[in-house]
Protein backbone atom coordinates (compact mmCIF):
# COMPACT_ATOMS: atom_id res chain seq x y z
CA UNK A 1 0.00 0.00 0.00
CA UNK A 2 1.28 3.46 -0.85
CA UNK A 3 1.85 5.82 2.09
CA UNK A 4 -0.55 8.18 0.34
CA UNK A 5 -3.30 5.58 0.72
CA UNK A 6 -2.91 5.25 4.46
CA UNK A 7 -5.42 6.86 6.76
CA UNK A 8 -3.56 8.96 9.34
CA UNK A 9 -4.06 7.66 12.90
CA UNK A 10 -6.70 9.20 15.10
CA UNK A 11 -4.98 11.97 17.02
CA UNK A 12 -6.04 13.61 20.24
CA UNK A 13 -6.22 17.37 19.86
CA UNK A 14 -6.83 17.29 16.12
CA UNK A 15 -9.05 19.91 14.54
CA UNK A 16 -12.59 19.34 15.67
CA UNK A 17 -14.01 18.32 19.04
CA UNK A 18 -11.92 19.57 21.93
CA UNK A 19 -9.57 21.56 19.69
CA UNK A 20 -9.11 25.30 20.15
CA UNK A 21 -7.95 26.94 16.94
CA UNK A 22 -6.74 30.32 15.76
CA UNK A 23 -9.09 30.72 12.82
CA UNK A 24 -7.93 32.29 9.60
CA UNK A 25 -9.22 35.66 8.51
CA UNK A 26 -10.48 35.04 4.98
CA UNK A 27 -9.16 38.47 3.92
CA UNK A 28 -5.65 37.47 5.00
CA UNK A 29 -5.16 34.52 2.67
CA UNK A 30 -1.89 34.50 0.74
CA UNK A 31 -2.62 34.14 -2.96
CA UNK A 32 -0.26 33.80 -5.90
CA UNK A 33 2.95 32.92 -4.05
CA UNK A 34 4.19 29.46 -3.13
CA UNK A 35 4.16 29.26 0.66
CA UNK A 36 6.38 27.01 2.78
CA UNK A 37 6.44 26.65 6.57
CA UNK A 38 9.61 25.32 8.21
CA UNK A 39 9.38 23.31 11.43
CA UNK A 40 11.70 21.30 13.65
CA UNK A 41 12.99 20.72 17.16
CA UNK A 42 14.12 23.85 18.98
CA UNK A 43 17.76 24.62 18.19
CA UNK A 44 17.93 22.29 15.19
CA UNK A 45 18.86 25.06 12.74
CA UNK A 46 15.51 26.12 11.28
CA UNK A 47 16.55 29.76 10.92
CA UNK A 48 19.83 28.86 9.24
CA UNK A 49 17.98 26.50 6.91
CA UNK A 50 15.19 29.00 6.20
CA UNK A 51 17.57 31.89 5.49
CA UNK A 52 19.81 29.89 3.18
CA UNK A 53 16.75 28.46 1.44
CA UNK A 54 15.41 32.00 0.94
CA UNK A 55 18.80 33.01 -0.44
CA UNK A 56 18.77 30.00 -2.78
CA UNK A 57 15.31 30.90 -4.10
CA UNK A 58 16.54 34.44 -4.71
CA UNK A 59 19.54 33.09 -6.64
CA UNK A 60 17.02 31.32 -8.88
CA UNK A 61 15.48 34.71 -9.64
CA UNK A 62 12.47 34.34 -7.34
CA UNK A 63 11.02 37.20 -5.30
CA UNK A 64 11.19 35.96 -1.72
CA UNK A 65 9.65 37.00 1.59
CA UNK A 66 10.79 35.33 4.83
CA UNK A 67 8.66 35.69 7.97
CA UNK A 68 10.22 34.81 11.31
CA UNK A 69 7.62 33.53 13.77
CA UNK A 70 9.59 33.36 17.00
CA UNK A 71 9.79 35.89 19.86
CA UNK A 72 13.62 35.61 19.63
CA UNK A 73 13.27 37.41 16.26
CA UNK A 74 16.57 36.05 14.93
CA UNK A 75 15.19 34.24 11.88
CA UNK A 76 16.39 36.76 9.31
CA UNK A 77 19.54 38.22 10.83
CA UNK A 78 21.89 36.37 8.45
CA UNK A 79 19.90 37.88 5.58
CA UNK A 80 19.83 41.43 6.96
CA UNK A 81 23.01 41.36 9.04
CA UNK A 82 21.14 42.59 12.12
CA UNK A 83 18.27 41.90 14.50
CA UNK A 84 15.41 43.86 12.98
CA UNK A 85 12.43 45.19 14.97
CA UNK A 86 9.43 42.91 15.17
CA UNK A 87 5.93 43.64 13.97
CA UNK A 88 4.79 43.59 17.60
CA UNK A 89 7.50 46.11 18.57
CA UNK A 90 6.48 48.44 15.75
CA UNK A 91 2.77 48.13 16.57
CA UNK A 92 3.49 49.02 20.20
CA UNK A 93 5.16 52.24 19.05
CA UNK A 94 1.94 53.36 17.34
CA UNK A 95 -0.29 52.11 20.16
CA UNK A 96 -1.49 49.25 17.93
CA UNK A 97 -2.88 51.50 15.19
CA UNK A 98 -1.68 49.62 12.09
CA UNK A 99 -3.05 52.29 9.76
CA UNK A 100 -0.17 54.52 10.91
CA UNK A 101 2.48 52.12 9.62
CA UNK A 102 4.35 52.14 6.33
CA UNK A 103 5.68 48.94 4.77
CA UNK A 104 9.28 50.04 5.34
CA UNK A 105 8.57 50.22 9.08
CA UNK A 106 8.41 46.43 9.37
CA UNK A 107 9.68 44.96 6.06
CA UNK A 108 13.47 44.98 5.67
CA UNK A 109 15.70 44.27 2.69
CA UNK A 110 18.03 41.30 2.99
CA UNK A 111 20.57 39.47 0.86
CA UNK A 112 19.89 39.57 -2.88
CA UNK A 113 16.56 41.35 -2.45
CA UNK A 114 14.97 38.91 0.01
CA UNK A 115 12.27 40.74 1.98
CA UNK A 116 12.48 40.06 5.71
CA UNK A 117 9.85 40.34 8.44
CA UNK A 118 10.06 39.32 12.09
CA UNK A 119 6.58 38.79 13.49
CA UNK A 120 7.86 38.53 17.05
CA UNK A 121 5.54 37.32 19.76
CA UNK A 122 4.08 37.98 23.16
CA UNK A 123 6.20 37.63 26.32
CA UNK A 124 6.65 34.08 27.59
CA UNK A 125 3.48 32.72 29.15
CA UNK A 126 1.22 35.41 27.75
CA UNK A 127 -0.75 36.05 24.58
CA UNK A 128 -0.99 33.98 21.43
CA UNK A 129 1.67 33.48 18.78
CA UNK A 130 -1.02 32.60 16.25
CA UNK A 131 -2.59 36.03 16.62
CA UNK A 132 0.78 37.67 15.94
CA UNK A 133 1.30 35.67 12.74
CA UNK A 134 -2.22 36.48 11.57
CA UNK A 135 -1.75 40.20 12.17
CA UNK A 136 1.58 40.13 10.34
CA UNK A 137 0.06 38.55 7.23
CA UNK A 138 -2.84 40.99 7.36
CA UNK A 139 -0.42 43.93 7.50
CA UNK A 140 1.57 42.56 4.57
CA UNK A 141 -1.61 42.27 2.51
CA UNK A 142 -2.79 45.76 3.45
CA UNK A 143 0.52 47.16 2.21
CA UNK A 144 0.41 45.02 -0.98
CA UNK A 145 3.68 43.32 -0.06
CA UNK A 146 2.46 39.89 -1.18
CA UNK A 147 1.39 40.89 -4.67
CA UNK A 148 4.91 40.85 -6.13
CA UNK A 149 6.18 37.83 -4.21
CA UNK A 150 6.90 34.39 -5.65
CA UNK A 151 7.88 32.54 -2.48
CA UNK A 152 6.93 33.03 1.18
CA UNK A 153 8.84 31.13 3.88
CA UNK A 154 7.53 30.94 7.45
CA UNK A 155 10.26 30.07 9.97
CA UNK A 156 8.25 28.72 12.89
CA UNK A 157 9.15 28.53 16.58
CA UNK A 158 10.42 25.23 18.02
CA UNK A 159 8.25 22.15 18.27
CA UNK A 160 5.46 23.67 20.36
CA UNK A 161 2.08 22.56 19.02
CA UNK A 162 -0.06 25.62 19.73
CA UNK A 163 -1.70 28.52 17.91
CA UNK A 164 1.70 29.95 17.01
CA UNK A 165 2.65 26.59 15.52
CA UNK A 166 -0.60 26.19 13.62
CA UNK A 167 -1.11 29.68 12.19
CA UNK A 168 1.45 29.39 9.35
CA UNK A 169 -0.12 26.07 8.34
CA UNK A 170 -3.28 27.98 7.45
CA UNK A 171 -1.31 29.76 4.73
CA UNK A 172 1.25 27.15 3.64
CA UNK A 173 1.18 24.88 0.61
CA UNK A 174 3.90 22.63 2.00
CA UNK A 175 5.47 22.06 5.42
CA UNK A 176 9.17 21.23 5.63
CA UNK A 177 10.71 19.65 8.73
CA UNK A 178 14.34 20.23 9.74
CA UNK A 179 15.78 17.31 11.67
CA UNK A 180 19.08 15.62 12.51
CA UNK A 181 20.33 12.06 12.61
CA UNK A 182 19.60 11.61 16.32
CA UNK A 183 16.77 10.31 18.49
CA UNK A 184 15.54 13.62 19.95
CA UNK A 185 15.28 15.34 16.56
CA UNK A 186 13.47 12.43 14.94
CA UNK A 187 11.16 12.09 17.95
CA UNK A 188 10.24 15.78 17.56
CA UNK A 189 9.77 15.29 13.81
CA UNK A 190 7.34 12.44 14.46
CA UNK A 191 5.21 14.68 16.68
CA UNK A 192 5.33 17.52 14.15
CA UNK A 193 4.18 15.13 11.43
CA UNK A 194 1.21 14.14 13.60
CA UNK A 195 0.31 17.80 14.17
CA UNK A 196 0.59 18.75 10.50
CA UNK A 197 -1.47 15.72 9.49
CA UNK A 198 -4.20 16.84 11.89
CA UNK A 199 -4.17 20.40 10.53
CA UNK A 200 -4.22 19.21 6.92
CA UNK A 201 -7.74 17.92 7.46
CA UNK A 202 -8.97 21.52 7.33
CA UNK A 203 -6.17 23.35 5.49
CA UNK A 204 -4.49 22.85 2.12
CA UNK A 205 -1.04 22.30 3.67
CA UNK A 206 0.71 19.00 3.00
CA UNK A 207 4.09 17.67 4.06
CA UNK A 208 6.93 18.13 1.57
CA UNK A 209 9.63 16.12 3.36
CA UNK A 210 12.50 16.65 5.75
CA UNK A 211 15.98 18.14 5.68
CA UNK A 212 18.70 16.30 7.58
CA UNK A 213 20.68 19.17 9.06
CA UNK A 214 24.01 19.26 10.91
CA UNK A 215 24.38 15.52 10.35
CA UNK A 216 27.37 13.55 9.10
CA UNK A 217 25.15 10.53 8.36
CA UNK A 218 21.45 10.14 7.56
CA UNK A 219 20.90 6.45 8.33
CA UNK A 220 18.52 6.97 11.29
CA UNK A 221 16.53 9.66 9.49
CA UNK A 222 16.23 7.43 6.44
CA UNK A 223 15.17 4.44 8.55
CA UNK A 224 12.42 6.48 10.15
CA UNK A 225 11.28 7.87 6.78
CA UNK A 226 11.15 4.39 5.24
CA UNK A 227 9.05 3.19 8.18
CA UNK A 228 6.40 5.92 8.13
CA UNK A 229 6.30 6.79 4.42
CA UNK A 230 8.17 10.09 4.56
CA UNK A 231 10.96 11.53 2.38
CA UNK A 232 14.30 13.12 3.11
CA UNK A 233 14.69 15.75 0.39
CA UNK A 234 18.01 17.32 1.40
CA UNK A 235 21.09 16.75 3.55
CA UNK A 236 23.12 19.59 5.06
CA UNK A 237 26.30 18.22 6.66
CA UNK A 238 27.73 19.20 10.03
CA UNK A 239 30.27 21.79 8.91
CA UNK A 240 32.05 24.43 10.94
CA UNK A 241 31.73 26.72 7.91
CA UNK A 242 27.96 26.84 8.43
CA UNK A 243 28.39 27.87 12.07
CA UNK A 244 30.93 30.51 11.02
CA UNK A 245 28.50 31.99 8.52
CA UNK A 246 25.95 32.54 11.27
CA UNK A 247 28.56 34.16 13.52
CA UNK A 248 29.44 36.48 10.65
CA UNK A 249 25.72 37.27 10.16
CA UNK A 250 25.84 36.09 6.55
CA UNK A 251 24.19 33.47 4.40
CA UNK A 252 26.33 30.74 2.86
CA UNK A 253 26.00 32.55 -0.45
CA UNK A 254 28.06 35.45 0.93
CA UNK A 255 30.86 33.34 2.37
CA UNK A 256 34.21 32.64 0.63
CA UNK A 257 34.09 29.98 -2.07
CA UNK A 258 35.56 27.14 -0.02
CA UNK A 259 34.87 23.71 -1.51
CA UNK A 260 32.64 22.66 1.40
CA UNK A 261 30.59 25.84 1.24
CA UNK A 262 30.16 25.57 -2.52
CA UNK A 263 28.81 22.03 -2.11
CA UNK A 264 26.28 23.06 0.54
CA UNK A 265 25.18 26.01 -1.61
CA UNK A 266 24.50 23.54 -4.41
CA UNK A 267 22.38 21.44 -2.04
CA UNK A 268 20.33 24.50 -1.07
CA UNK A 269 19.85 25.41 -4.73
CA UNK A 270 18.76 21.83 -5.43
CA UNK A 271 16.32 21.97 -2.51
CA UNK A 272 14.88 25.27 -3.74
CA UNK A 273 14.43 23.82 -7.23
CA UNK A 274 12.75 20.72 -5.79
CA UNK A 275 10.28 22.79 -3.77
CA UNK A 276 9.60 25.22 -6.61
CA UNK A 277 8.92 22.42 -9.09
CA UNK A 278 6.51 20.81 -6.62
CA UNK A 279 6.76 17.86 -4.27
CA UNK A 280 4.41 14.93 -3.90
CA UNK A 281 1.95 15.62 -1.07
CA UNK A 282 3.08 13.13 1.55
CA UNK A 283 0.83 11.46 4.11
CA UNK A 284 3.18 9.61 6.47
CA UNK A 285 1.77 7.61 9.36
CA UNK A 286 3.42 8.93 12.56
CA UNK A 287 4.48 6.29 15.07
CA UNK A 288 3.28 5.94 18.66
CA UNK A 289 5.95 7.05 21.13
CA UNK A 290 6.75 3.48 22.19
CA UNK A 291 7.34 2.45 18.58
CA UNK A 292 9.79 5.33 18.09
CA UNK A 293 11.82 4.01 21.02
CA UNK A 294 11.77 0.51 19.58
CA UNK A 295 12.79 1.74 16.13
CA UNK A 296 15.60 4.08 17.16
CA UNK A 297 16.44 3.08 20.74
CA UNK A 298 19.69 1.43 21.70
CA UNK A 299 19.96 -2.35 21.93
From Swiss-Prot:
**Required cofactors, per record?**
[4Fe-4S] cluster
Q: Name one Pfam family in it.
A: Fer4_NifH
- Binding sites annotated in the UniProt record for Mg(2+): 47
Keywords, A to Z, come to: 4Fe-4S, ATP-binding, Bacteriochlorophyll biosynthesis, Chlorophyll biosynthesis, Iron, Iron-sulfur, Magnesium, Metal-binding, Nucleotide-binding, Oxidoreductase, Photosynthesis
Sites binding [4Fe-4S] cluster sit at 128, 162
Q: Tell me the pathway.
A: Porphyrin-containing compound metabolism; bacteriochlorophyll biosynthesis (light-independent)
Q: Iron-sulfur: is it a keyword of this entry?
A: yes
As its record notes, the protein acts as a catalyst of: chlorophyllide a + oxidized 2[4Fe-4S]-[ferredoxin] + 2 ADP + 2 phosphate = protochlorophyllide a + reduced 2[4Fe-4S]-[ferredoxin] + 2 ATP + 2 H2O
Q: How is the cofactor bound?
A: Binds 1 [4Fe-4S] cluster per dimer.
Residues annotated for ATP binding in this entry: 43-48, 72, 213-214, 237-239
Its domain of life?
Answer: Bacteria
For the region Disordered, give the residue spans.
1-23
Going by the record, the broad EC class of this enzyme is: oxidoreductase
Q: Which GO terms describe its molecular function?
A: 4 iron, 4 sulfur cluster binding; ATP binding; metal ion binding; oxidoreductase activity, acting on iron-sulfur proteins as donors; oxidoreductase activity, acting on the CH-CH group of donors, iron-sulfur protein as acceptor
Tell me which Gene Ontology terms the entry assigns under biological process: light-independent bacteriochlorophyll biosynthetic process; photosynthesis, dark reaction
- Which InterPro entries would you find in this protein's record? NifH/chlL_CS, NifH/frxC, P-loop_NTPase, Protochlorophyllide_ATP-bd
Enzyme Commission no: 1.3.7.7
- Give the similarity note: Belongs to the NifH/BchL/ChlL family.
Q: How does it assemble?
A: Homodimer. Protochlorophyllide reductase is composed of three subunits; BchL, BchN and BchB.
Q: Per its UniProt record, what HAMAP family does this chain match?
A: ChlL_BchL
Q: What does the protein in this record do?
A: Component of the dark-operative protochlorophyllide reductase (DPOR) that uses Mg-ATP and reduced ferredoxin to reduce ring D of protochlorophyllide (Pchlide) to form chlorophyllide a (Chlide). This reaction is light-independent. The L component serves as a unique electron donor to the NB-component of the complex, and binds Mg-ATP.
Q: What is this protein called?
A: Light-independent protochlorophyllide reductase iron-sulfur ATP-binding protein
Q: Which organism is it from?
A: Roseobacter denitrificans (strain ATCC 33942 / OCh 114) (Erythrobacter sp. (strain OCh 114))
In the UniProt record, what gene is named as encoding this protein? bchL
